[in-house]
Amino acid sequence: MGVLKIEEIPHYTYEDYAHWEGKWEIICGVAYAMSPAPMIKHQSISNKIARQLDEIFENCKRCKALLPIDWKLAIDTVVQPDNLVICNENLDKAYITKAPKIIFEVLSKSTAKKDEGIKFRLYESEGVNYYILVNPDEKMAKAYSLRDGKYIKIGDFIDEKLTFELNECDKPLEFDFSKIWE
């Protein structure tokens, strides 16, 4: 059996992705199949995150909390964060193009490595202000804040509150982690 050459590996684009069935992401042209359906615990936590983000961003009209939506970073890179906050983005398109201000990824066995590795570096390089990795099994979230182009760990959160400071909002906004584990 011969060795696979780099030029023989498929390089996918958004155009390819737009025609696929099922849930996929592409990062730098590499296709990643997503879990068919998240576990109930994953969905429950994601829904609680979404509700709380909706509430805290109610008074910040320039920002919107969203559930998974395509974020098209390049012709060959499209991801779908579990929960995200966008600001000053056109809401009439099928996907977003600007970096979200906040991203939550709820870890699962099938996505943890990608969320903690390639997506961590991708979100950092794209300028996502806050990245929160939520571990349902440990009931703990690791929060990172972007400082000078690099993520700095803010801390591990179980029942604490995290304050988001965004230029688009008149005042800091507080997220209560104790509410997502109930």
Language model segments and positions:
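Gly/Pro/Ser/Thr-rich low-complexity, intrinsically disordered segments predominantly at protein N-termini
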Residues: 1-182
